Amino acid sequence: MFSMVTGFMNYSQQTIRAARYIGQSFVITLSHTNRLPITIQYPYEKSITSERFRGRIHFEFDKCIACEVCVRVCPIDLPVVDWRFERDIKKKQLLNYSIDFGVCIFCGNCVEYCPTNCLSMTEEYELSTSDRHEDYTIQTVMNSTQIKIDKDKPFDSRTITNY
């Protein structure tokens, strides 16, 4: 008989403990009802980026001196800098500068080490497109206007990864 009373006491203690845990959980749930929502409705509301956000890289063609520091500090050797040496002025003349944003890891090394500050990180983070061929096109900047390289040329894996 004593074991039956002890079992009933253990059962009642466990029931009271379970009710207490359920009550505590309910109080926590009710405390969250007065809070404002944290999530944003993405397509309709844009998130505010921080001051040092590393978005799409902006390039100013006129400031570049074709020193290729950006290529040397890039962990994946991504920027492609085409230039020719002008003998009459004894300087490099930039012909073409391109970065493939499908491969870029947005580390910001090129922006940080650029001696002329011709590279900068923008707050643009929507780089995806609905056309799968646009994802791997190389963005080229000439005369401060952005144009895309011929999309009719097919890209293969060697073209995209070997620079």
UniProtKB/Swiss-Prot annotation:
<dbReference type="InterPro" id="IPR004497">
    <property type="entry name" value="NDHI"/>
</dbReference>
<dbReference type="GO" id="GO:0008137">
    <property type="term" value="F:NADH dehydrogenase (ubiquinone) activity"/>
</dbReference>
<dbReference type="InterPro" id="IPR017900">
    <property type="entry name" value="4Fe4S_Fe_S_CS"/>
</dbReference>
<protein>
    <recommendedName>
        <fullName>NAD(P)H-quinone oxidoreductase subunit I, chloroplastic</fullName>
        <ecNumber>7.1.1.-</ecNumber>
    </recommendedName>
</protein>
<keyword id="KW-0793">Thylakoid</keyword>
<feature type="binding site">
    <location>
        <position position="64"/>
    </location>
    <ligand>
        <name>[4Fe-4S] cluster 1</name>
    </ligand>
</feature>
<dbReference type="InterPro" id="IPR017896">
    <property type="entry name" value="4Fe4S_Fe-S-bd"/>
</dbReference>
<comment type="subunit">
    <text>NDH is composed of at least 16 different subunits, 5 of which are encoded in the nucleus.</text>
</comment>
<keyword id="KW-0408">Iron</keyword>
<keyword id="KW-0411">Iron-sulfur</keyword>
<keyword id="KW-0150">Chloroplast</keyword>
<dbReference type="GO" id="GO:0048038">
    <property type="term" value="F:quinone binding"/>
</dbReference>
<keyword id="KW-0479">Metal-binding</keyword>
<feature type="binding site">
    <location>
        <position position="74"/>
    </location>
    <ligand>
        <name>[4Fe-4S] cluster 2</name>
    </ligand>
</feature>
<keyword id="KW-0934">Plastid</keyword>
<feature type="binding site">
    <location>
        <position position="104"/>
    </location>
    <ligand>
        <name>[4Fe-4S] cluster 2</name>
    </ligand>
</feature>
<feature type="domain" description="4Fe-4S ferredoxin-type 2">
    <location>
        <begin position="95"/>
        <end position="124"/>
    </location>
</feature>
<dbReference type="InterPro" id="IPR010226">
    <property type="entry name" value="NADH_quinone_OxRdtase_chainI"/>
</dbReference>
<feature type="binding site">
    <location>
        <position position="107"/>
    </location>
    <ligand>
        <name>[4Fe-4S] cluster 2</name>
    </ligand>
</feature>
<dbReference type="GO" id="GO:0051539">
    <property type="term" value="F:4 iron, 4 sulfur cluster binding"/>
</dbReference>
<keyword id="KW-0520">NAD</keyword>
<dbReference type="GO" id="GO:0009535">
    <property type="term" value="C:chloroplast thylakoid membrane"/>
</dbReference>
<keyword id="KW-0472">Membrane</keyword>
<keyword id="KW-0874">Quinone</keyword>
<keyword id="KW-1278">Translocase</keyword>
<feature type="binding site">
    <location>
        <position position="114"/>
    </location>
    <ligand>
        <name>[4Fe-4S] cluster 1</name>
    </ligand>
</feature>
<keyword id="KW-0618">Plastoquinone</keyword>
<feature type="binding site">
    <location>
        <position position="67"/>
    </location>
    <ligand>
        <name>[4Fe-4S] cluster 1</name>
    </ligand>
</feature>
<feature type="binding site">
    <location>
        <position position="110"/>
    </location>
    <ligand>
        <name>[4Fe-4S] cluster 2</name>
    </ligand>
</feature>
<comment type="function">
    <text>NDH shuttles electrons from NAD(P)H:plastoquinone, via FMN and iron-sulfur (Fe-S) centers, to quinones in the photosynthetic chain and possibly in a chloroplast respiratory chain. The immediate electron acceptor for the enzyme in this species is believed to be plastoquinone. Couples the redox reaction to proton translocation, and thus conserves the redox energy in a proton gradient.</text>
</comment>
<feature type="binding site">
    <location>
        <position position="70"/>
    </location>
    <ligand>
        <name>[4Fe-4S] cluster 1</name>
    </ligand>
</feature>
<keyword id="KW-0004">4Fe-4S</keyword>
<dbReference type="Pfam" id="PF12838">
    <property type="entry name" value="Fer4_7"/>
</dbReference>
<keyword id="KW-0521">NADP</keyword>
<feature type="domain" description="4Fe-4S ferredoxin-type 1">
    <location>
        <begin position="55"/>
        <end position="84"/>
    </location>
</feature>
<dbReference type="GO" id="GO:0046872">
    <property type="term" value="F:metal ion binding"/>
</dbReference>
<keyword id="KW-0677">Repeat</keyword>
<comment type="similarity">
    <text>Belongs to the complex I 23 kDa subunit family.</text>
</comment>
